Amino acid sequence: MTDQKQMNTVDSMLPIPQLFAFGLQHVLAMYAGAVAVPIIVAQAMNLPMEDLIRLITADLFTCGIATLIQTLGFGKIGGRIPMIQGVTFASVGPMAMIGAQHGMTAIYGAIIIAGLFTFLIAPFFSRLIRLFPPVVTGTIITIIGINLMPVAINWMGGGIGNPQFGSFTNIGLGFLTFLIVIFVYKFAKGFFSNLSVLIGLIAGTAIAFAMGVTNFDEVGRSHWIAFIEPFYFGLPTFDWASVLSMIIVMLVVMVETTGDSFAIGEIVDKPIGRQELASIIRADGVSTIIGGILNSFPYTAFAQNVGLIAVTGVKSRFVVAASGVILILLGLFPKLAAIVASIPNAVLGGAGIAMFGMIVASGIRSLGKVSFEGNHNLMLVAISIGVAMIPIAAPNFYANFPAWAQIILKSGITFGSIMAILLNLLLNGVNRGDEIKEMGRR
């Protein structure tokens, strides 16, 4: 049985078997989202299957490198917190447009320059931390959870585009997985209780296999080893309009990363100050540069995994570092990736309901420490969450806006976060009370 105190700090080192068991749990939770962007880009560019496979393996490999950079850190790069890294969905639209006009090499040229921009601007962006008092961070954490819930719900239905979406089989599998997670979380002890999501995913997949809903045929068709070749599509080219659009994407990423950082800090009881935030954003920049070199994409924190930390209570950054090692192996050995890919969406959705709901609960807990008397905080929270839900309630609401504006507006997390910051400035001013001074000194 695992000693709970052994896992209740960010710097706790667990036995190797436990590290990789908990690390695998994180990988299974994020895998579907991790491979979605390369699939979408390949489809938009009409790339052959061989190139799609290269994009997926390069993405997984670079996800692992990016996660190791963020969790282990070196020098002033990396936050040294349990933050798993994945490709940002904010980059999909701009990359598709750049690729259609200028080809893959222009995509990677823009990514490399945008990554360098992110690295250089990190210490300046981190000075904005005084704009994130507890009412803003609590609101942003809540918004992150709310905006992730549709992901889990669509997974539970079978995945968008699935002709069997919403079938009794898919929904039943999702709820069964959800119930298994709850049962293990409630009645198992120690180590196994903390593995409730992993056990739910494995049990749900086994049930799906017995029902004929999933199979492992793709494992046999996959190659044993993949080679990650830098600049596979050619040396990068630089179109400055494309570079500018990717820089806008990275500004959005910095806002989202800030929110995710505060969410993780809240859950693992580690204050995120100016220096920590700068290190986290620098890591995003370095990982994005590496992504451009290795035929991958811009990197940021994967909010899906924040909820998993809250569910399991395992706060060790070395667990997520183990996830990084597993992701590297998945990128190098496609047969392993094919096994993970066989987990049905419905099963992922059942686990996702619990994970993403925990992010919402963490945000509410954070807001519970905020005073709503004699100030405008209630209006700030109400409007920020309201505008963040627009893309959820009406996905085409901003369809007639310019492409650059849609990058911001169609992300409920980004627009809701920006709204919370602006409303705090408008309604409360730049509060220089004790809370903000304490954050600014870090």
Name each region found by the language model.
Residues 17-30, 34, 166-178, 195-196, ...:
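Hydrophobic, membrane-embedded alpha-helices of multi-pass small-molecule transporters
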